[in-house]
Amino acid sequence: TSATNIFIAGGGKLADSIRQFDQLHAIGEEPSHWLCVRALSVTARILIDVLPEAALVDSLEEVRALIATRPSRICVFDPMPMLTGEQSQRGSTSLPRSWAVTSDSIAAHLAELLGATELALLKSNLPEAPSIQQASEEHFVDPYFPTAAAKLPLVRCVNLRSEAFEEVALKI
């Protein structure tokens, strides 16, 4: 069957720079969180340049429309509108606004809201241990990820730096 692949680009060096800035200037977790969310908008646009066949979307409605009309389409999701209140006003559970949440938890949250059958985390390595909790403890995923991913049927990690694209399913 066809599947819609929805990418959320991580914050990468932009988020790392914001974290360093916060450590130096103590701007606080919530303001830093929102700066990192803005960075995700930037990295989403960078990813669109790398994947020109992908559609840039920024709402659940756009994703659902894409799934309904073009189920095999690739899209890049800019989570900023969802996280700044667009979706939480409709009753969805919001994520903590802190360093405990990264693009991993945001992707898990989106997957849950969409009723996805699986979440694939594309990483540069694989976790040492195959459980979500242990992956969080070893900083492979963020501290909130075990909560964000708790209701997902399947979470896979794929090593993009492996020639064979090795993968492992994380146990909940």
Task: Give residue ranges: language-model regions.
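Nucleotide/pyrophosphate-binding catalytic subdomain
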Residues: 1-168
